[in-house]
Swiss-Prot record:
One of its GO terms (cellular component) is plasma membrane. One of its GO terms (molecular function) is quinone binding. Its main location: membrane. It is found in: Cell inner membrane. This is NADH-quinone oxidoreductase subunit C. PANTHER family: NADH DEHYDROGENASE [UBIQUINONE] IRON-SULFUR PROTEIN 3, MITOCHONDRIAL, NADH DEHYDROGENASE UBIQUINONE IRON-SULFUR PROTEIN 3. The gene is nuoC. It comes from Neisseria gonorrhoeae (strain ATCC 700825 / FA 1090). The lineage of its organism: Bacteria, Pseudomonadati, Pseudomonadota, Betaproteobacteria, Neisseriales. Its EC number is 7.1.1.-. NDH-1 is composed of 14 different subunits. Subunits NuoB, C, D, E, F, and G constitute the peripheral sector of the complex. It holds the Pfam family Complex1_30kDa. NDH-1 shuttles electrons from NADH, via FMN and iron-sulfur (Fe-S) centers, to quinones in the respiratory chain. The immediate electron acceptor for the enzyme in this species is believed to be ubiquinone. Couples the redox reaction to proton translocation (for every two electrons transferred, four hydrogen ions are translocated across the cytoplasmic membrane), and thus conserves the redox energy in a proton gradient. It is a peripheral membrane protein. It catalyses: a quinone + NADH + 5 H(+)(in) = a quinol + NAD(+) + 4 H(+)(out). It comes from the Bacteria.
């Protein structure tokens, strides 16, 4: 636990006011910063000799519109990065809140961490978060003609359109979703008959 406290103090000392909030909880350090400080925070964490978080392990978008089964009062979208210092054997999380809920935009960290390239494309594709100065921001998991962003909490579970092969046209076509609701009755297995006994 002493190393977590040392890391906490080092991060607070290095980042200063750029880190909006530094949280130490459950044996982990989380840095929450504003979008205008995001690049400088990530650069400091990467380059500073006392920190040296040279590896971006993960970057993802988060939609907080409903959080813990209730309406969320803060910003809707955040980008969360998990960083690793191989040299110091330490991990840190960075959360940046995106300013605009209607058109979420944050700066790209692909110039600092090469691995951010595809992670940012995934966050763009699934959450609609735009990354300024990204070298190749385009969809990575859904079709190019896909409408919407499927990991947003307001996206319908069934989607908007479905794709199928049309024998007459000899090509793949899109059509509105045609899912018929049905009642599903669960099969109940009684303990006394379980396993054929």
């Amino acid at each position: 636990m002493a190393s977590i406290q040392n890391l906490y103090e080092t991060v607070v000392g290095v980042l200063g006011d750029q880190a909006g909030k530094v949280i130490s909880a459950l044996g982990e350090i989380t840095v929450e910063c504003l979008p205008e400080h995001y690049i400088s925070v990530m650069t400091a964490l990467h380059d500073h000799e006392d920190l040296h978080f040279e590896l971006l392990v993960d970057l993802c978008g988060v939609d907080y519109s409903t959080y813990k089964n209730e309406a969320w009062q803060g910003k809707r979208f955040a980008v969360v990065s998990q960083l690793l210092s191989v040299k110091n054997n330490q991990r840190i999380r960075v959360r940046v809140w995106v300013s605009d809920d209607d058109f979420p935009v944050v700066e790209s960290v692909a110039d600092i961490y090469n691995s951010a390239d595809w992670y940012e494309r995934e966050a763009f594709d699934l959450y609609g978060i735009m990354f300024n100065n990204h070298p190749d921001l385009r969809r990575i998991l859904t079709d190019y003609g896909f409408v919407g962003h499927p990991f947003r909490k307001d996206f319908p579970i069934s989607g908007y359109v479905e794709m199928r092969y049309d024998e007459e046209q000899k090509r793949v076509i899109y059509q509105p979703v045609t899912i018929e609701p049905r009642e599903i009755t669960p099969r109940i297995v009684r303990e006394e008959n379980y396993g054929g006994q």
